């Protein structure tokens, strides 16, 4: 999707206005303590810009986790975020115990100039997502009239709307698409994310390499399909490589992952690659295990030898790493989505770590390297490479849908320029 034609915060006049801002404060918590404040820090530039440019107030709304519909458990409260935000901004943050309704509307109607207000978790109301589950696990659907009321109440909390929640941009939730204000702009985090993906997908540097890992082919069909129209080379690694190798080379894969559904379209994908002149690199050797366990016995295998019955491949071997390194060395732009082994376990992390080292090396020689959220972003955190690649996405699902060529509802809803 083209992202260059949307209103962004730097072009929005906020002076004297109440800004209602959707952020992504869905942070990990343990015993009501925040264990990683990255997402809160990521929203600070947009908040500060509004305050520095004379906004009357900044009203922040976010979800946290996925609470049941009904009584609101403390562990899903955004109260601890207000405390963290106060220390990051160096100014008071008013926390409200709800996100809609007469009391919230009153508190946000005419606040003191320069106020920062944080609303309670949006998902305490089923109207945010439109559906949910009650405490017994029964499905609950929101009534259309109540969704309208919920959206109207959110719309009363500001004069202009800013969306800086890239991580939720693929969800058509009320706070993402239902705030009805004349000007709706993307915040700085949203802008940074969209700029990277726009550049990568709309005018890539070439050769352009996609590294695709992860487990199931079926989950990645749309991704592979869309990227085959854009890239010059593709590494297909991780668990899904076994489905390709079994279909294409009739390789014995033991108890490695095999995706029945995905297997049906492997040949179509390969013929599309051939037609588009895309060079595909698959692994040629493996680190194997006698069970799916951190402390499993390990072995080695190649495509030619196959993996014996009762064993499974959990990482690529050193020959595969050499092939991957050659592909990385040829690239001027890389998008990486999905690890190439079970990186969480030391015995099976070498392949992903070796690939990460090559991607870092490529970045230092001027290659544009984009890590698409989720597990691959976790790899960056694990090996401290977040600042050694060009961009690590904050949105797993959102970045995946962009790479699949889908329109993101949260971006689509912003004002055109």
Swiss-Prot record:
Region (Associated with globular domain 1) residue spans: 406-417
Species of the source: Equus caballus
Region (Mitochondrial targeting region exposed following cis-trans isomerization by PIN1 and recognized by the TOM complex for mitochondrial translocation of the protein) residue spans: 38-43
Binding site for ADP: 214, 238, 343
Protein name in UniProt: Phosphoglycerate kinase 1
Entry's localization field: Cytoplasm, Cytosol; Mitochondrion matrix
Organism ancestry: Eukaryota, Metazoa, Chordata, Craniata, Vertebrata
Residues where N6-acetyllysine is found: 11, 48, 75, 86, 91, 97, 131, 146, 199, 267, 291, 361
Residues bearing PTM Phosphoserine: 2, 4, 203
Binding site for AMP: 215-216, 220, 239, 313, 344
């Amino acid at each position: 999707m083209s992202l260059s034609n949307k209103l962004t915060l730097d072009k929005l006049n906020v002076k004297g206005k109440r800004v209602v801002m959707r952020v992504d404060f869905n942070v990990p918590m343990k015993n009501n303590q925040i264990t990683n404040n990255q997402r809160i820090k990521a929203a600070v530039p947009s908040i500060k810009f509004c305050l520095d440019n004379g906004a009357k107030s900044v009203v922040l709304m976010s979800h946290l986790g996925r609470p049941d519909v009904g009584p609101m458990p403390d562990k899903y409260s955004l109260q601890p975020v207000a405390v963290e935000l106060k220390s990051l901004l160096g100014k008071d943050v008013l926390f409200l115990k709800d996100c809609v309704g007469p009391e919230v509307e009153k508190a946000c109607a005419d606040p003191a100039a320069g106020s920062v207000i944080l609303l309670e978790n949006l998902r305490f109301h089923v109207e945010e997502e439109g559906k949910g589950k009650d405490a017994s696990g029964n499905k609950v659907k929101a009534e259309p009239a109540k969704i309208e009321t919920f959206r109207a109440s959110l719309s009363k909390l500001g004069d202009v709307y800013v969306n800086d929640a890239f991580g939720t941009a693929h969800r058509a939730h009320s706070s993402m698409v239902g705030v009805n204000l004349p000007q709706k702009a993307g915040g700085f985090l949203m802008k940074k994310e969209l700029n990277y993906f726009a550049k990568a997908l709309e005018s890539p540097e070439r050769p352009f390499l996609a590294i695709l890992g992860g487990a199931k082919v079926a989950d990645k069909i749309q991704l592979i399909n869309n990227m085959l129209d854009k890239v010059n080379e593709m590494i297909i690694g991780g668990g899904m490589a076994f489905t390709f190798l079994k279909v294409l080379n009739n390789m014995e894969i033991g108890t490695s992952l095999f995706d029945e559904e995905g297997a049906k379209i492997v040949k179509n994908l390969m013929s599309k690659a051939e037609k588009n002149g895309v060079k595909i690199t698959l692994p040629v050797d493996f680190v194997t295990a006698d069970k799916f366990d951190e402390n499993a016995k390990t072995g080695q295998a190649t495509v030619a030898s196959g993996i014996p019955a009762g064993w499974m491949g959990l990482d690529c071997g050193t020959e595969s790493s050499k092939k991957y390194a050659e592909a990385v060395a040829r690239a001027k732009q890389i998008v990486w989505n999905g690890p190439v082994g079970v990186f969480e376990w030391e015995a099976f992390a070498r392949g992903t770590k070796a690939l990460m080292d090559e991607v870092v090396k490529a970045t230092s020689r001027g290659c544009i390297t984009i890590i698409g959220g989720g597990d691959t972003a976790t790899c960056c955190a694990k090996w401290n490479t977040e600042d050694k690649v060009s961009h690590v996405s904050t949105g797993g699902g959102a970045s995946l849908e962009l790479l699949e060529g889908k329109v993101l509802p949260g971006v689509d809803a912003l004002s055109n320029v």
